[in-house]
């Protein structure tokens, strides 16, 4: 008997989703998978008033949490930052009694506006992407979650339709079975 694939909560955070061809292409396979709940934060919370109990319930129901977003000023879009600060609260995700996410998996899926070569100590952005993402890795650790290597689509707006389709296929394959031996 085959085991069921892990339940994935895909938190999508892009304030200008209609303008992001890359993110729309990446998101498409997720909407076709029964084990994935795609949750567009900007569509649900345009006023930034986050339903914290609802979001925490969604987190409890899933084993893998994916944060799909563009890189904004070396961080994340404002609503996702608000979501992280409010939903991953002390007593729920960290601190005394805060073990609701312990043992779950965190993966960042990020699009950038610059090439990979711009993310080096001697390049334009002065730091590699691993340094830029360190606060998110620390947040995963604070929640006692397993940090999975991020998926990064560099220079997303310059990717050809074929390249984006290839990234989307690989992403969809991973989402379909994220905890398989080759998926982590």
Curated annotation (Swiss-Prot):
Quaternary data: Interacts with KefB.
Protein's name according to its UniProt entry: Glutathione-regulated potassium-efflux system ancillary protein KefG
GO biological process, any: positive regulation of potassium ion transmembrane transport
Cellular location(s): Cell inner membrane
Enzyme Commission code(s) on record: 1.6.5.2
GO CC annotations on file: plasma membrane
Stored InterPro entries: Flavodoxin_fold, Flavoprotein-like_sf, K_H_efflux_KefG, KefG/KefF
Enzyme class (EC, first level): oxidoreductase
Reactions performed catalytically: a quinone + NADH + H(+) = a quinol + NAD(+); a quinone + NADPH + H(+) = a quinol + NADP(+)
GO MF annotation terms: electron transfer activity; FMN binding; NADH:ubiquinone reductase (non-electrogenic) activity; NADPH dehydrogenase (quinone) activity
Membrane topology recorded in Swiss-Prot or TrEMBL: Peripheral membrane protein
Pfam families, A to Z: Flavodoxin_2
Keywords: Cell inner membrane, Cell membrane, Membrane, NAD, Oxidoreductase
Family designation: Belongs to the NAD(P)H dehydrogenase (quinone) family. KefG subfamily.
Cited function: Regulatory subunit of a potassium efflux system that confers protection against electrophiles. Required for full activity of KefB.
Organism, as annotated: Shigella dysenteriae serotype 1 (strain Sd197)
């Amino acid at each position: 008997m085959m085991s069921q694939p892990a339940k994935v909560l895909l938190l999508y955070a892009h304030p200008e989703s209609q303008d992001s061809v890359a993110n729309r292409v990446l998101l498409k396979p997720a909407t076709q998978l029964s084990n994935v709940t795609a949750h567009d934060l900007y569509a649900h919370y345009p006023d930034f008033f986050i339903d914290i109990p609802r979001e925490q319930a969604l987190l409890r129901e899933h084993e893998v949490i994916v944060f799909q977003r563009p890189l904004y000023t070396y961080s994340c879009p404002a609503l996702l930052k608000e979501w992280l600060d409010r939903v991953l609260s002390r007593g729920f995700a960290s601190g005394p009694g805060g073990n609701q996410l312990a043992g779950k998996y965190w993966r960042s899926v990020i699009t950038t506006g610059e090439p990979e070569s711009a993310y080096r100590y001697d390049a334009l952005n002065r730091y590699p992407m691993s340094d830029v993402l360190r606060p998110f890795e620390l947040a995963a650790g604070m929640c006692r979650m397993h940090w999975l290597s991020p998926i990064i689509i560099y220079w997303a707006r310059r990717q050809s339709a074929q390249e984006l389709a290839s990234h989307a296929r690989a992403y969809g394959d991973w989402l379909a079975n994220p905890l398989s031996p080759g998926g982590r």
